[in-house]
Amino acid sequence: MSTNKNHNNNTNNNDNNICINPHIVEFLNKQITNIKNRPGADIKTTSIYKKAIRSLNLYPLPVFSGKECEVLNGFGPSLTKKINDYLKTTSHPLYPKGPPTPLKSIYNRNNNNNDNNNNNNNNNNNNNNNNNNNNNNNNNNSPKKKIRKSKNNNTTSTISNTQSNLIGTESPSKNQNKQLERELKSKKKKQQSAILEQIVEEEDINFEIPTNENYYDYGSGSCFDNNDDNDDGYISSGINTTPDDLNKSFNFDFGSFDNGIPNYNNNNDNGGDNENNINSDIDSNKIKTTTSINDNHKEKYQKNNENYIHENEDNGDDVIVLISPIKTYKYGDMLNKSPSKFKSPSKLRSHNTTNTFNNSNFSNSDNDNNNNIRITTPLKNQNFNKFNDSIIFSPSISSPSPSKLSNYHKYLNNNNNNIKNTPISTSKKRKCNFSSPLLFSPFKYGVTSPFSPSKMKLKSPFKKRFKNDKSPSSSISKNKNSKSNDIVNNDFEDDDEVVNIQSESEINNNNNQFTSHNDNYNYSYNYNNNSNNINNNNNNDDDDDFDLTETEDEKDDYDKDDRTFSNLSVRLSFTEEDLAGVNIGESIINNSKLPKVIPSQIPPPTQSTQSTSTSTSTSKSKSKSTIKIKFKNIKCIIDNREVKSVTERDYICNKLNERGINAQVKKLELGDFVWVAIDEHDNEWLLNYIIERKRVDDLSSSIIDGRYKEQKFRLSKSGCDNIIYLIEGIVSNTINSSSQSQKKTWGTVNFSLSPDALATALVTTSICEGIIIKETKTIDNTIDYIVNITEYFKEKLLKNNNSGGGGGDEIIKFLFANKNTQCTLENFNQLNSKSKGLKLIEFFATQLIQIPGCSAEKAHSITQVYPTPMSLYLALKAIKDKESGESHFKDFTFGKNKRRFGQDVSEVIYNLYTNKKYLN
């Protein structure tokens, strides 16, 4: 099956690109099949060979050594060495006799001429035999060796000629010997100078990569045109001719580079003059063709093109044009410079392979930029030269901030008008206005959203802004006596709740309004759903009203500690009508802070209301309040999915009850063990501890399918500060053991994950996420650990019952989220339910987390700037340059240390949200 897949991949690649090096591609495919067929081999290593195959399919030049592959993507030192060893024993299928360069034909031509000169000397039979042997070996030798051998052959032939002339004569005198030496030296100098001139001119040879259409500029004032109706001349090539070019003739034949001198088809009688000078440096490589040209342009071509126009015919209509591959023309910039003689592509300077053409007509105008075509190559680190007609890249357009995008941000005028029509449901009684797109609405449950600035470990980057900004625009609250400039963000039109927020300075300025009315208030909040007084005061749908009547799930959204929404240094503002049904004490006046809700005189639960009425007892001398509550029991709640086996589903609960622990089995949306404290009125108070139990095999499977990462994230955002990850099974002992066979056997049982991989995951969880890792050997050890924790809670929370209650802050740290607010088990399940109604920003954040390399902190940073997928799409769509778009998120920061995203994640996000298939 693997061979068939490789064959299909190769055929698909060959359909798009004709591979010039099929033997190397075949060799790499064999390497891939060998790796796949090898037992225990790492299949990921085949990606290197596949990348090399893609580069070879795009590379337009033949490869004759492994060193030439160094410039290609996917070829490292080891792979280059393998290919080099392979090419030593395998010839190129298209060029079996070596590289097809023009220099080879020139060297063969010179060697053949030397053979002809040596054959004329009848007395040098031995030298002729040596020369023939050398010429036969020159096909496999390098060009430098050919030059040296030809030079040695010429010197030996001259010496033998001089010696043969002296045979039969008397012994030469000293003067004659000196004369012979001088002649030999002069001949050597002439030969060396001729060879140097030949090499210098050969280095200037241009060998263009063949393309579909080749156009040449001959330096004329007006270029040749293919239109017969035009008065200008035309020139056409026999290669890749089109139907329009069938009536034009341009005959030439480069011949085979392996057969010596190329053959030229000259149709004119004057071509014989060229054949006499076949050994010259320029005329030997010229190609003669006949073109039609207008009389008005004859003189112009004769003056400007001395190297091309050979002579005029008698009729004056035809001109013989000689084309040479040697660089003897003036206007050679339009041709693409090819590799010089026998140089590896790794040593070549990068060049731009840009061909400019306009359909079938060649255009020489500088304004014709739309017809430029850029041919990409698989070379590494391409540096393109600058041409007048090069591709013009549009400047990078930085994405505007969300506050500047008119598509989804609208600002009110500065004329102190009220908020205009906003599509907010009138059924919701709590209404608010946002000061900026960066302030999010609190959520309806007792804990804010995981993606709100208050719940992330990273403190909000906008904290200092609210502290220092005392301008009227920072205020969002609206009193009846004063108005402020409000900003409406249409991205949050679907938010369920809104808050009236006022800066800390404005609260101090408005303290006098509260002193005249709030002297006898007692600071208690009534959350009963049947409070008629509050409901009667909120019949008006005015935007300034603040309704405190809400369900138990929505109560006390803004009463948070340093990690909550109040951390943004803003305070809630109420009007007299809003506070008509509640008691307000003196803490607002003295401290200008929202008091903490503290349970006091809690009535027993009734059928009509499951929530409790809480109040605070404060005094002028004490800013901090103490809790007066008595707990009578601690209950351990076990998830109904935590069982020992199918037959013993209640094993854990029964064992805990036998040990004197009040344990119950209930459904938990998150976690496996939680604790609830029962007060004297039988009200439940969720404690600030949660345990997630994992067997070793379950941990391995959760890491593979991704549940491990998701559960850690949900646990960190559950509201519980003390998260315990309990691993049931032997992990540490297996890791520390020296037996490799034991590790291998252990890993096969646990989804092929080694103990080292599991240990790495646990250490990362403990250090990065701050989660407590606890290991137990068996389920009985797990039960012992649960018993010890429960006894600890009893000691801390029930020890002061006989002394009349108390505890203060010592009790608060054991309550859910370190708050003095009651949270029941039902509220906890609603808060952490997977199927709860997510807001758009939460749904968008969970979508971003699924992207490889995008963590929760990175998703939070993105949603701070782009709160909706549409805002992100519009911002990326405004970036026209792909390179700048792929690096758009590169400089985004995340985490406490303000680390950068990097290029890889930025490219993935850009390509995902700009992909047409994804948008459809």
From Swiss-Prot:
Residues 108-142, 152-165, 265-282, 351-372, 471-490, 505-539, 607-620 have a biased composition (Low complexity). It comes from the Eukaryota. Its EC number is 3.1.22.-. SMART domains: ERCC4. Residues 457-467 have a biased composition (Basic residues). The keyword Metal-binding applies. It is found in: Nucleus. Residues 540-556 have a biased composition (Acidic residues). The keyword Ribosomal protein does not apply. Pfam families: ERCC4. Residues 90-190, 265-297, 335-376, 457-490, 505-560, 595-621 are annotated as: Disordered. Belongs to the XPF family. Interacts with eme1. This is Probable crossover junction endonuclease mus81.
